[in-house]
């Protein structure tokens, strides 16, 4: 089974090629625009923007990571969601959760593992995660890869979660137990609003499980964000109202980085 069958099979082996690739993705997002992709890619290749040893390696990162995550993923042209933060010179601690969120959406293998395995760990089921746990989960999902490929994908998945700050540790990984900065959560909520989520859906959205947050924890985060004037949060019984002090991503990026 190859990567072109993703419309039928949700999981790919792409993570074996580099995991998070966070710095590479940031460089490409900063270089991207609404010009034809072929023209931008050619400039990136000529300048060796990613400082790779060969053009083939740079092109591989573009094809296997940047395209599915930030050009042709579940959110088309997702680079436009995070670019305003880069233009506002947001610090790494603020942009990293947003890149993680978009990557987990584009790589269902990563997102589902976080929801189904790590979200349970956050509630006290198990404290550590190793390659064997990932491989067992792959087997439960019927992943069709060879043992060698499965091991490489498992290592790439764990490395990605470490680089995104979800896990910590070298060999035996454990949950970092750190909540993303409020500005990051507020910015993701604003992106979800632009994708059509209403106020109640923002609190209950399944994407918060990627950060091991229950609806109650999301509500508390929104209350703190309200106090920090990142958004306005009102709740009366089952009625929830969330409003943002901006109409565009560019405006809101300035709000969360002030």
Where are these regions (language model features)?
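Short acidic alpha-helical/loop segments enriched in Asp/Glu that coordinate divalent cations
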Residues: 126-129, 146-151, 167-179
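Short amphipathic alpha-helical interaction segments
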Residues: 53-60, 145-163, 211-224
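Eukaryotic partner-binding/assembly regions in large regulatory complexes
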Residues: 1-105, 109, 113-120, 129
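Short, leucine-enriched amphipathic alpha-helices that occur as contiguous helical runs
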Residues: 110-115, 131, 154, 184-189
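Accessory, usually C-terminal, subdomains that scaffold auxiliary metal cofactors
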Residues: 168-251
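Short helix-capping/hinge SLiMs at alpha-helix to coil transitions
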Residues: 122-126, 195
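DNA-recognition alpha helix
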Residues: 128-144
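Beta-rich nucleic-acid/ligand-interaction surfaces
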Residues: 136, 154-157, 179-180
């Amino acid at each position: 089974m190859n990567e072109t069958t993703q419309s039928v099979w949700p999981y790919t082996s792409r993570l074996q090629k580099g995991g998070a690739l966070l710095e590479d993705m940031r460089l490409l997002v900063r270089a991207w625009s609404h010009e034809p992709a072929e023209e931008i890619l050619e400039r990136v290749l000529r300048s060796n923007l990613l400082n790779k040893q060969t053009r083939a390696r740079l092109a591989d990162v573009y094809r296997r990571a940047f395209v599915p995550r930030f050009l042709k993923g579940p959110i088309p042209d997702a680079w436009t969601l995070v670019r305003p933060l880069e233009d506002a010179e947001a610090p790494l601690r603020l942009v990293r959760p947003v890149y993680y969120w978009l990557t987990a959406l584009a790589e269902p293998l990563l997102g589902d593992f976080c929801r189904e395995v790590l979200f349970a760990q956050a509630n006290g089921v198990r404290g550590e995660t190793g390659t064997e746990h990932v491989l067992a989960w792959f087997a439960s999902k019927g992943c069709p890869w060879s043992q060698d490929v499965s091991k490489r994908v498992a290592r790439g998945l764990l490395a990605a979660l470490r680089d995104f700050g979800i896990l910590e540790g070298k060999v035996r990984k454990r949950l970092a137990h750190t909540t993303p900065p409020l500005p990051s959560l507020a910015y993701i909520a604003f992106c979800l609003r632009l994708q059509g989520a209403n106020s109640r859906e923002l609190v209950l959205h399944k994407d918060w499980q990627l950060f091991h947050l229950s609806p109650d924890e999301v509500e508390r985060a929104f209350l703190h964000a309200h106090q920090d004037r990142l958004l306005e949060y009102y709740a009366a019984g089952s009625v929830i109202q969330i409003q943002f002090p901006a109409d565009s991503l560019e405006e809101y990026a300035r709000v969360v980085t002030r």
